[in-house]
Structure formats: C-alpha cells, structure tokens
Amino acid sequence: QGEYWRLFTATFMHFGFEHILNNMLVLICAGPILEKAMGHIKYLCLYLIAGVGGSTLSYVQMIARGKYDVSAGASGAIFGIIGALLWIVMIHKGRYESLTGKGLLFMIVISLYYGITSVDVDNWAHIGGLAMGFVLAIILYRKPRKAVDLSGENPYTN
C-alpha cells in the first residue's frame, strides 16, 4: 500500500522481551568490534542499510509467495553486522580481533538452522541483512596499512 517506511521502522520493532534480548546480546558482542573496525558513521550506515536490506528481501519473498506475514526485529541489521565481520575476517586471513572465520560461519549456520526449525522466524530478513552487510563491507571497509618506520633507525636494536 505504499508504506515503504515500514522497511526501515520494522528494524526497531520487536515481538517481546526475549526477542529484543536475543538481538541485543548479539549486538553487544559483535557491534563494538565492527564499529572499531569501520568507524562510527560507516557502522551506523551499515546497520541501518542492512536492516532495510533484510526487510526488503523479506518483503520480496512475501510478494513471490503471495503470503504476507508480519515481520519485525533488528536481526536483519544484526546479521548485516555479522556479514560485514565475515568479510573483514576473510581479508585478514581468517582472524580479526577475537573472531575467526570458522567461528562466524558456525554462528551463521546455527542461527539459520534455528530459524528454519522454529516457527515465525523470518530467515529471509536474516539472509538479506547478511548479504547486504557483506556487500557493504566490501565497499566501505579498508584494511589498515602497516605503519612504515621512515626514521632510518633499526627498531630491533635499542
């Protein structure tokens, strides 16, 4: 009905205390790592755009099925954070801060499996957010360059 702002606002709505608690626990663990890696503004942009990306994929699949469900929650945006961290871990050769590629992939698989085997979990929003976060990280994240000592002094002889 043209109410496209709902693709944005759904990220801030939740279906109860347990729903918001689960999302906030993951956000508290993963968010600061990504914010430190990307900076405040890029992190905020990624979070918001990944949330809209998750909502959009969810909506597109509802149109394709012809079945419309209520969808809400921050998990699309949070999966966007996970997708971005997956890219960052990949370009840092499988490890970044306390994260490993295997650990992130395990978490993604377990989370999606839980969603598939549970009732009323919008995996399309999760997948959309994950993909959007991954793509945005490719665009926005720049691996820091190693510092070069131009003083001419040997750092190993002091």
Could you tell me what each predicted segment is?
Residues 1-158:
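A detector for small-residue-rich transmembrane helices and their helix-helix packing motifs
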